[in-house]
C-alpha cells in the first residue's frame, strides 16, 4: 500500500502542471486538522525531493506543496477560538517554523520560479506568526533576510529584499498596513 507522500511524490516527479496542480488543490481542500496530520508524513519527503532534484519545476512544485502544508493563518486563528477544532498550539508553531526554515533555503534557489514561489509562501508563514503575535520571530526573519540579501546578488538579492519588505509590512500597525497597502495599490494613480 502506498503512502500519501508516495502518491504525491510520483505526481511531483512527473513535472506535469496539471498533476502538480491536482496535488496542490487536494492539500488545499483538506481541513486544518487533516493538513496538520498529513504534514508529518509529507514535509520531509517534499524537502528531500526538493534538495535532490535538478529540475527547477519539480523544486518549485515541492515549494508549492510545502506552502499548502504550512499551518498558515487559519490554523493560527482557530487557536484563538474554542468553538473550532484546531491542532495543538505547539504543533502550529513547530510546523510553521519548519516550513519557514525550508522556505529560507528555497528563496536562495538558482531558479527564479522557485524563489518567487518561496517568497509567496513566506508571506503565509509571516501571516501565521503575526496572528500568533510572534513579533520577535518576524523581527528575526527580517534580520535573516537582510543578511541573506547582503550576501546575494542580482535577482536573488532582489527577491530576498522583497521578502524582507513583506515581513516588515507585518511589523507595522494595522493603520500603517492599510495606508501602505493603499499606496502600493493606487500610488501611481494618486500622483496623476
Q: What residue ranges belong to the model's regions?
A:
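N-terminal "cap/leader" segments of large eukaryotic alpha-helical scaffolds
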Residues: 1-25, 182-190
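Buried hydrophobic core positions in alpha-solenoid tandem helical repeats
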Residues: 8-9, 42-48, 88, 102-104, ...
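Alpha-solenoid helical repeat scaffolds
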Residues: 22, 61, 65, 102, ...
Amino acid at each position: 500500500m502506498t503512502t500519501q507522500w508516495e502518491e504525491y511524490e510520483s505526481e511531483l516527479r512527473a513535472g506535469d502542471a496539471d498533476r502538480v496542480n491536482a496535488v496542490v488543490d487536494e492539500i488545499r481542500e483538506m481541513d486544518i486538522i487533516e493538513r496538520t496530520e498529513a504534514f508529518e508524513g509529507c514535509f520531509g519527503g517534499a524537502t528531500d525531493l526538493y534538495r535532490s532534484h535538478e529540475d527547477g519545476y519539480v523544486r518549485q512544485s515541492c515549494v508549492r506543496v510545502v506552502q499548502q502544508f504550512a499551518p498558515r493563518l487559519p490554523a493560527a486563528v482557530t487557536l484563538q477560538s474554542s468553538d473550532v477544532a484546531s491542532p495543538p498550539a505547539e504543533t502550529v508553531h513547530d510546523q510553521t517554523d519548519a516550513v519557514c526554515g525550508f522556505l529560507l533555503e528555497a528563496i536562495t534557489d538558482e531558479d527564479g520560479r522557485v524563489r518567487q514561489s518561496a517568497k509567496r509562501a513566506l508571506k503565509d508563514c509571516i501571516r501565521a506568526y503575526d496572528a500568533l503575535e510572534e513579533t520577535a520571530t518576524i523581527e528575526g526573519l527580517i534580520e535573516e533576510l537582510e543578511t541573506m540579501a547582503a550576501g546575494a546578488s542580482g535577482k536573488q538579492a532582489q527577491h530576498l529584499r522583497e521578502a524582507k519588505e513583506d515581513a516588515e509590512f507585518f511589523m507595522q500597525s494595522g493603520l500603517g498596513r492599510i495606508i501602505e497597502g493603499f499606496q502600493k495599490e493606487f500610488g501611481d494613480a494618486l500622483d496623476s
